[in-house]
Amino acid sequence: MRPIRLVAAALSLTFAGPSFGWIEYQSQADHFSINFPDEPEVRDIEYLTEQFLTLPARLYSYEDGPSRYSMTVVDFSNTEQMHAERLANCEAELGGGDSCNNPWSTELRGAMVHAAWNLMQRAAQVTHFSYYFSDLVEGQRLHLTNADGSRTYAAIHMHENLLYIMEGTVPAGAPEPALFQQSLGFIDEAGDRIRYRSIYTNGFPPPPSFTYQ
């Protein structure tokens, strides 16, 4: 993945009750912006795909008492080449046929579904699962009730072959983490936020867009 450069800007937010300071956090390496309670921890990790590729990924996370916030970004840009290398000897070993077809396009198109499936396998009850979009980048949204009564609010998107998995978990009885949930944006190389004029679907030509700061 690309070298990481990060930008964080302070937000001043007021509630009916205590006042909390959040930041608008940007990762120019992974082309997104999102609100966190404070600077998140960033770790390089690995991600196993549905077709058993191990891809480079990055985990951005922050714990605020019993509440947890995270963004996982997985780089799918080299999946075609990686599958081709894995199938290099397929015809000689298996004699060709469907077993030797490169599944990279299926891998890309199914990435969000597989990520949602992984969330559903947790020891939690799924209470909501729907189509969703953020800044007109399409995705999926899930709500889960965990064994301890806490609630996880997750959203999954794919933009320019990067898979984004965001999760906000709050204690039982706490309100939804709206400041986190509703803040996701996608940014260009200059750090400007991209806004599409119609729905963006990964793998298809992007619709017209404009940028703003």
What residue ranges belong to the model's regions?
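Short, solvent-exposed coil/turn segments at beta-strand boundaries
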Residues: 35-39, 64-67, 136-137, 157-164, ...
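Hydrophobic helical h-region of N-terminal Sec-dependent signal peptides
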Residues: 9-13
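Surface-exposed amphipathic alpha-helical segments
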Residues: 40, 93, 109-122, 160-213
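Bacterial N-terminal signal peptides that target proteins for export
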Residues: 1-8
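Conserved polar/disulfide-associated segments of primarily extracytoplasmic proteins
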Residues: 48-151, 155
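Short N-terminal segments immediately surrounding and downstream of signal-peptide cleavage
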Residues: 21-39
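A mature extracytoplasmic/lumenal domain signature
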Residues: 29, 38-40, 46, 75, ...
